[in-house]
Every structure is written in C-alpha cells, then in structure tokens.
Amino acid sequence: MTIRLVIVEPEGAYNLGFIARLVKNFLIDEFYVVNPKCDINEAIKFSAKGSEVIEKMMKITNNFDDAIRDVDLKIATSSIADIKGDLLRKSIRPIDLERLIKDKKVAFIFGRESVGLTREEIAKSDFLLFIPANPEYPVLNLSHAVGIVLYELWRNRDNKVPTVSSEPIKLIDDYSKKITDILVNKEATKSMYLVLKRVLIKGIEDNEEAMTIVRILRKIYVRLAKKENESDKLL
C-alpha cells in the first residue's frame, strides 16, 4: 500500500506545519500541496520534526490534476456528506477504508479550511470520505481530520484482508463509464457513473469477485454498444 496525501490550497501555516508533522508520524509515502495560500516558511515553524518533510519531501503544484495523477484510487474528504438527492455526496466511512485500499496506491485529498473541496474536485475522485462527528458541529479542523484518517490507515496497515488488484478496478471504472454514457442522458451521466462505480467497487471482497463483475459489465457493454450501432444504422 502506498499513500499519497494531497492538501488543496491550505490557508493556515499552522495547519500545514501540523500536517507535515503527521506525515512523519505516520510514514506517509508522498505529500502534495496544491497552490498553497499560506507562508511555507511560517509553516516550517509549526512542523517541529516535520520540517524536513516540508523542505525535502513536499511537492508543490498549482494544478489539482497533477496532484492526483498516477494512483489507483482517489479518495476525497468532506464534512458535508449524504445529502438527500445529491449523489456526489454519497460517502464512505473510515471503517470502509481497510478493504478498499489494501495493496493499492491511494491519494487522500483534503480541501481548504474555509470551503473544503469544490464539487468539481470531488467529482474527479473515486470516493468521498466522511468522518462522523457531532451532527450539530461536524466540521473538524483540517489537521485534526488529517490526523484521524492517517491514524486509521496506520492502525490497519498490518491487518490481513482479502485484496483486489488495481487492474480489475480500472476495468470496472472503464466499463461503468461506457455503460452510463450509453444509457443515461449527458446531464446525469457523471452522477450515475460515480454511483455505479462506487457501489460495485465497495462491494467487492476479492479478485475472483472483481473479475466476475468485469465479465458481467463487459457483456452488458458489448450488447448495449451493438444495439446502439444497429439503431444508428436505421436512422
């Protein structure tokens, strides 16, 4: 398992410093910061032993897509989740992570202190992670939220769970997109695709199940594509 931590436009130097320390605490593999809005030198003052993380390990980019490239799964985080009728906000919990990320390269994405991640940024992710808290005050400090997630990853790192390789996951992603492109009107395609992909991937226990799902999706796609081509010829 390889973990990449992505922080988008951090606004507080203290939070960035505390997060750098957490990166060292929990042996995170990669640390990306997108378009930081705070003073990096100021952040170093808050990082203690994590100063070398900022100075040597942290990668700064101005492009969100660059920060989430070349990973198997992208997991966004938000304190706003499971809003009725909002498919984009359907979430998973920290307890779901163990099985989903085993033996994969995963990016965990945290947003701005003020407004979090945009809907566009969440839509580019595979899952939305929500940390349950007091419903009347669910918003956690950025560095605290990062700490909770990284602790969960550390706690489960040596547990033996069935693994699903990245290749069938990519195929499920691909066929889910192709099927929804055919079946659903363009306005609803993105939401339906995300829901289909999330439900399928979340429910898979091992590679055998994953490949069974891939075969089913492939057959569905081939039949749908054939019917669509036949319909086009009649026009």
Curated annotation (Swiss-Prot):
Q: Which residues form a coiled coil?
A: none
Keywords of the record, alphabetical order, are: Cytoplasm, Methyltransferase, S-adenosyl-L-methionine, Transferase, tRNA processing
InterPro entries xrefs: Alpha/beta_knot_MTases (IPR029028), RNA_MeTrfase_TrmJ/LasT (IPR004384), SpoU_MeTrfase (IPR001537), tRNA_Cytidine-2'-O-MTase (IPR053648), tRNA_m1G_MTases_N (IPR029026)
**Enzyme Commission number(s):** 2.1.1.-
What the entry lists under Pfam families is as follows: SpoU_methylase
Q: Does the keyword Protein biosynthesis apply?
A: no
> What is the recorded phenotype of mutating K45E?
Decrease in activity
Gene3D superfamilies in the record? 3.40.1280.10
What happens on changing K49G? Answer: No change in activity
Quote one Gene Ontology molecular function term. Answer: tRNA (cytidine(32)/uridine(32)-2'-O)-methyltransferase activity
* Localization per record: Cytoplasm
Query: What does the UniProt record say this protein does?
Result: Catalyzes the formation of 2'O-methylated cytidine (Cm32) at position 32 in tRNA. Is specific for cytidine.
What is this protein called in UniProt?
tRNA (cytidine-2'-O-)-methyltransferase TrmJ
In which organism is this protein found?
Sulfolobus acidocaldarius (strain ATCC 33909 / DSM 639 / JCM 8929 / NBRC 15157 / NCIMB 11770)
Source taxonomy lineage?
Archaea, Thermoproteota, Thermoprotei, Sulfolobales, Sulfolobaceae
